[in-house]
């Protein structure tokens, strides 16, 4: 795994070695020390201290460790955690998730050994004493929407309370690629970050080229069934519905955006019957406590077209939900899954191979064909290709 050794001052490892040799020669001459001292810059001083300055996506100037000094990183949420471990899991200083055994099976080795230190997501808290005791050197905060003044205040407070630099990153859907490049540069993982960014850009461009020109009246209608009874959903305005829109679906959920901060707007069964979607994507009943089996088997749902046609699909959830939570890079696999499922003739890919590729690149987990098919569940093979 290659690392980037360039500092903010523009000194590479090679030029630093050359500089060191020249400095040693100069110091052997009378008066050289004062000459050298007079030439040192603020950036140069920071470099020798193992520090550099970056301007984060909130416009904040943050002093952080240079890549050669960076060993332990934490994050304010599971969303940011995925960026860190997908780039360099050995730099992860703890966990913002409490993973199940099923989720751990698809994650880098050693994840189960890391301490859970909390998360600010969903109004949660981070254990600040543990954060400092574990010698965390840097914290990433990644936002799935535009960074707000409240977000900035929260990160400033965290930085002030702990003395640990906090870097804020815009991780909104179309900025995921740039977020990877920015974080990768800070972590000394520019080559790997570029590989992931290019991969995501390729997925997005290919899917949009395949489904982006479908007129609204010809789009497949879809209902996203959340919660234990399937009677919560996400309207188009919700960030949790973004994957469906990008994949060319016509989201039928004509409900207000939830003000809870968690999504999941309430829906009545009568409304779903009236919308009569062609496809339903539901949470699974085992991992997420969803209503996929209820929807498939209950007489109350049987009048809906998606149920009658056998087009109720369970969203894969291990180690993360493919379409929405967290709203991060996992959505790019969901983008492929939904586009291929709704429009197999337009977006004709082998989802078994795509799942294997994604898990290998992003999660460091090489899975078999059977494991990929197990994750895909009843959506493999896609409807329309049976």
Report each predicted region and the residues it spans.
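Bacterial Sec-exported substrate-binding components of ABC uptake systems
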Residues: 2, 6-28, 36-82, 191-224, ...
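Solvent-exposed loop/turn segments at secondary-structure junctions
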Residues: 79-82, 98-101, 144-148, 172-176, ...
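Structural recognition of the beta-strand scaffold that forms the well-ordered cores
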Residues: 74-75, 93-95, 138-142, 166-169, ...
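Short helix-initiation/N-cap motifs at beta->coil->alpha
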Residues: 59, 117-127, 257-269
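Alpha-helical, coiled-coil/dimerization segments enriched in small aliphatic residues
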Residues: 237-262
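Structured C-terminal subdomain patch of bacterial secreted/periplasmic proteins
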Residues: 174-180, 185, 198, 288-386
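A short, structured surface patch at a secondary-structure boundary
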Residues: 76-134, 138-149, 252
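Extracytoplasmic ligand-binding site segments that recognize negatively charged/polar headgroups
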Residues: 101-103, 123, 144-153, 167-182, ...
